[in-house]
Amino acid sequence: MPKPIVAIVGRPNVGKSTFFNRLIGERRAIVEDIPGTTRDRLYGDTFWNGREFTVVDTAGLLFGDEDPSLPEVEIARRTRVQAEHAIAEADAIIFMVDGRDGLTTADADVADILRTTAKPVVLAVNKCDSQERMLDAVEFYALNLGDPIPMSAFHGLGTGDVLDRLTEYFPPKTFEKDEERHLRVAIVGRPNVGKSSLLNRLLGKERSVVSPIPGTTRDPIDTTITYYGEPITLIDTAGIRRAGKIERGIEKYSVLRTLRAIERCDVAMLLVDATEGVTAQDTHIAGMVIEAKKGLILVVNKWDAITKDSQTYYEFEHRVREAFKFVDYAPIVFISALTGQRVSHLLDYAREIYAQRQKRIPTSELNNFLREVVVQQPPMAVKKGAHLRLYYAVQPQTEPPVFLFFANDSELVHWSYARYLENRLRERYGFQGTPIVIVFRSRERKEER
């Protein structure tokens, strides 16, 4: 079941970023060193009441850093744009207002917009860091958006109440029956790299509106086909375009659409334009796929438009591999969606990666493997004088494959040894196209006897 997307909207300086950082601070610290992601995240995942959801800093996504010194008219316009995009893209909305400032005209204007949607809206009155402020929150009943919830993002007061209300709106958890599970493939990439053309080629018909104007594919489109007797769902998305002027904020907001598609897929086909080469946006999207731990195929499209000699393919492949060296397990396929060149290979790769993601190594075999690789290269502890020992390993999860290694002290494991184990696992068992997760856990002392 896809994670709900929650957008935080409100005027500048009401505390949206403070609340956002409080929600995803730990998560952000974990992923900030992944290639293709940045330290200042605009979105992230968090948990509450047993539910995981994606929270989005809507203002930052649309406009970058907020400037409270902007003219009041411009602040109001930007806040309205946030609300409109949240209504269009999010599953639920947190509307944040400032309890110190009290009710403003801009707040009322946004409330008018939010009341037009059937999507749930939680009214959070921030900066209520005293009993008096909390009592003043009743003023916001006038917005007619339900009970205002007093809170302080800075101190953490009342944030749990906001999240309690939010998760009440989430649909009940559902679990697919085994027979309903089948391969889902997302076609992702920047605008005008040929995503819809590829979808049409795979379908053999015009399913999406295709135009040289970037962004003509507006919303994710799901189509299920049958390939060698097996159903495959293809998800086409609006592309991600480089940051531009405020008026083009809607293009930056397409990040949410790609996030949603990646979250729902098993394998992502990331299209790169051969005529432009690999861009920073391409590697950023690859980082999103890594973070979601989904399978990945690097697809170089428009290969027919490249003038070639005997070395062109090898030189271009080397450049692509260098740019995406942080996903060296992903296959590279050169295609032309226009002519159909090698397009048929893509579904074969996707099916194989899907199978690799479901692969499970028997515990006995995995521990034979562990003994072998430890003998070949014993682990070195990160602390001088300390001795690191790896006892045994299990694979508790698939999709993606997760391997849990028990050690005398997990803090002694150097990152390079985790990389060594991953490389050896791939050499022995494949796992082409899918990330694998290596986890170390300290064994209890009483177990060491």
Swiss-Prot record:
Binding site for GTP 1: 10-17, 57-61, 126-129
One protein family per Pfam: KH_dom-like
Listed SUPFAM superfamilies: P-loop containing nucleoside triphosphate hydrolases (SSF52540)
InterPro entries for this protein: AAA+_ATPase (IPR003593), G_ENGA (IPR031166), GTP-bd (IPR006073), GTPase_Der (IPR016484), KH_dom-like (IPR032859), KH_dom-like_a/b (IPR015946), P-loop_NTPase (IPR027417), Small_GTP-bd (IPR005225)
PROSITE patterns per UniProt: G_ENGA
Gene Ontology MF term list: ATP hydrolysis activity; GTP binding; ribosome binding
Domain EngA-type G: 4-174, 183-358
Keywords for the protein's UniProt record, in alphabetical order: GTP-binding, Nucleotide-binding, Repeat, Ribosome biogenesis
UniProt xrefs under Gene3D superfamilies: 3.30.300.20, P-loop containing nucleotide triphosphate hydrolases (3.40.50.300)
GO biological process, one term: ribosome biogenesis
Domain KH-like: 359-444
Annotated positions binding GTP 2: 189-196, 236-240, 301-304
HAMAP family per UniProt: GTPase_Der
Family from the record: Belongs to the TRAFAC class TrmE-Era-EngA-EngB-Septin-like GTPase superfamily. EngA (Der) GTPase family.
Role of this protein: GTPase that plays an essential role in the late steps of ribosome biogenesis.
Assembly and interaction partners: Associates with the 50S ribosomal subunit.
Protein name per the record: GTPase Der
Biological source species: Chloroflexus aggregans (strain MD-66 / DSM 9485)
